[in-house]
Amino acid sequence: MKAHQSLHVVAGFVRFPMSKTGQSRCYSILKDISIPASKQKFVPSSGTYPKGFLAAGAHAGVKESNTQFPDVALICSETPCSAAAVFTTNKFQAAPVQVSKQVLEAREGADITGVVINSGCANAVTGKGGLEDAKSMSAKVDECNGTPSTSSKRPSTLVMSTGVIGQRLPIEKILNTIPVAHSSLSSTHKAWLTAARAICTTDTFPKLLSRTFTLPSSPNHTYRIAGMTKGAGMIHPNMATLLGILCTDVPISPAALKLLLSHAVSRSFNCISIDGDTSTNDTVALLANGAAGGQTITTPSSPNYAAMQTVLTSFAQSLAQLVVRDGEGATKFVTVRVLNSPSQADARAIASTIARSPLVKTALYGKDANWGRILCAIGYTQGIQAGTVVPERTSVSFKPVDGSEELKLLVNGEPEIVDEERAARILQDEDLEIVVDLGGGERGEEGMGGEEGIYWFCDFSHEYVTINGDYRT
């Protein structure tokens, strides 16, 4: 049974000023938080947030160039939570990743009270000192919550950081700011949006969503989920690619929460790509405090499990897609869908290869229907089964956003005569879908299959190089 959902994403922007040109990109959001006109529609002007969760953002000045904007965020629950997280697979895991893992393992995903996040410095590859800094951030929040961690009492706050790698945190600034943020914790939309703003780096807009929904066992009972994320570059999954904090007031056990999050991440944050790089810091955490009451979800056989999985996966996909829409220098949001593969793994591998191809991405930026680059990426995909890609069965097309007929580029290995004028019109739109049909037929046919894989990605522009060339300046 599917859950009923209501998405609170309202066009408009209430506090962050728009740039004079309406189109400028913030190369460093700490210097300029102007929101391009085309991005304002993605910033919510209202929201409905989970019961018992509070948010705040405050200014610490982690980067010396940041003299006024929030760069420390807190998300706290008024009651202890179940928590789960998925972390980067990068071998150089940042100090906050290591500390958050320790917190979750020590408490077995139970009795977590919140998350503290800083932007402006990744606290990655910073040695033992960096680990102590991350631990002190967790301890300071616990102290503010009135539950200080001691030698016999384990920390209960997760830690996240984002920014430049290889630099120590200005830890005293952050520790002095945490009580300031804690004193302003609130359940208001303003507080949540300020927290979402505080975790931004090269992002052009804060990424915040909230939804209300019902579950089968309590059809007249309203539940809530909210989440924020950051990320515009160094985005390619495995997990993960960014920072994400999701909160819900549904009662869920730690074991069930871990399963729910893993499934959702594999179909959302692990299906996006900006530039093919996987960060040292990236983390997606899910907190559930049960404040809305009702039956606790404990196992996949629980009455509400399947419906909750649907809600969470859909919500995570919406958050992940916001990251792609804010890709550094991006002008396009592209969906690549691979059909009729012998396995979902092969379909996703092919979609991933297309999504991270610089030649595909630059062609799309140039509005060039150069489908040969797509075909090339399909052909060099690594790690797929023999026989997955058969040139004589492969078809490629562009699917316009207006719902009109697909523009066929290649059909069963034979090139089509392409209407270049129509192709140019399709590529003028911000959104585009690329459909790759491997011609595997319906599931069950011998040697064939009907599995599908999907990825979301953006194009590469001149601006991507400028942003990343200037990142530390």
Curated annotation (Swiss-Prot):
Its main location: mitochondrion. InterPro entries: Arg_biosynth_ArgJ (IPR002813), ArgJ-like_dom_sf (IPR016117), ArgJ_beta_C (IPR042195). SUPFAM superfamilies: DmpA/ArgJ-like. The alpha and beta chains are autoproteolytically processed from a single precursor protein within the mitochondrion. The record marks A240, T241 as: Cleavage. Pfam families: ArgJ. It is found in: Mitochondrion matrix. Substrate binds at T201, K230, T241, E328, N468, T473. Its EC number is 2.3.1.35, 2.3.1.1. Pathway: Amino-acid biosynthesis; L-arginine biosynthesis; L-ornithine and N-acetyl-L-glutamate from L-glutamate and N(2)-acetyl-L-ornithine (cyclic): step 1/1; Amino-acid biosynthesis; L-arginine biosynthesis; N(2)-acetyl-L-ornithine from L-glutamate: step 1/4. Keywords: Acyltransferase, Amino-acid biosynthesis, Arginine biosynthesis, Autocatalytic cleavage, Mitochondrion, Multifunctional enzyme, Transferase. Gene3D superfamilies: arginine biosynthesis bifunctional protein suprefamily, ArgJ beta chain, C-terminal domain, L-amino peptidase D-ALA esterase/amidase. The active site is at T241 (nucleophile). One of its GO terms (cellular component) is mitochondrial matrix. It is an enzyme of class 2 (transferase). The record marks T162, G163 as: Involved in the stabilization of negative charge on the oxyanion by the formation of the oxyanion hole. GO terms for biological process: L-arginine biosynthetic process; ornithine biosynthetic process. Transmembrane segments: none annotated. The keyword Transit peptide does not apply. It catalyses: N(2)-acetyl-L-ornithine + L-glutamate = N-acetyl-L-glutamate + L-ornithine; L-glutamate + acetyl-CoA = N-acetyl-L-glutamate + CoA + H(+). Catalyzes two activities which are involved in the cyclic version of arginine biosynthesis: the synthesis of acetylglutamate from glutamate and acetyl-CoA, and of ornithine by transacetylation between acetylornithine and glutamate. HAMAP family: ArgJ. Belongs to the ArgJ family. This is Arginine biosynthesis bifunctional protein ArgJ, mitochondrial. It comes from Paracoccidioides brasiliensis (strain Pb03).
